[in-house]
Swiss-Prot record:
This is Izumo sperm-egg fusion protein 3. It is a single-pass type I membrane protein. The lineage of its organism: Eukaryota, Metazoa, Chordata, Craniata, Vertebrata. It comes from the Eukaryota. Its main location: membrane. It comes from Bos taurus (Bovine). Monomer and homodimer. It is found in: Cell membrane. The gene is IZUMO3.
Amino acid sequence: MGDLWLLLLLPLSLAAFHGVKGCLECDPKFIEEVKSLLGKLVPPEVPGRTHMLERQMKEMIRLSFKVSHRDKMLRVLAVQKVVDLRTWLKIELDKLSKEKWKGVFILQGRLLDIRKNLDSKLEKLLKKFSEVACSEDCVVTEGPILDCWTCLRITSRCFRGEYCEEDDPKKAESREIGLFLILLAEGVILGGVLLLFHFCISHQRKMKAIRRSLKTYLEKKLEELMGIKDEKEKDFRGRE
């Protein structure tokens, strides 16, 4: 178990030291075989043949780099699965080499289909392997395992730690910060609601006080007017 922890929890400088790669790039012999098979697909007289073959070779091989670096859980795979995938690719290219030449654009379309299938197969294999290797009962995997990032073979069988998306200090810190920001936002919103409620209640009380004062004022004025009216009537009657 110790060598697995050492491999998966070392800083990324380890990967940089060995050269960050993909599952299909770890075997130089396989790369030469793919290069040879691609060379059989294009007649020598085709303009720009060398440049096109180099580009197709790069896209075909580096595809595994793109897939395995989408997620840390897509980093390792059983060596036998890698071998099976390489065999499948060589068979597909060999089949294509036996077909009649139909032009550059047709060939590029066929190679694109092969790359799409390769992408799908590789991602499914990596995901399936990670699900088995990171299961709760620590399922023991059979055969050697390849770290596609460093091209190193892993001897341990049970997978834990960062590879299985278990507690990562940086992720835990990010979650805590996110939770704090959420609570802070909720506190600000709640405070704003309470302040608005207090303002509305205070305003309502002030309006009631104003209405009472206005009512009292009007009642007094009305009484004064009624008193003046009564006095005038008495004065008028006295004159009669």
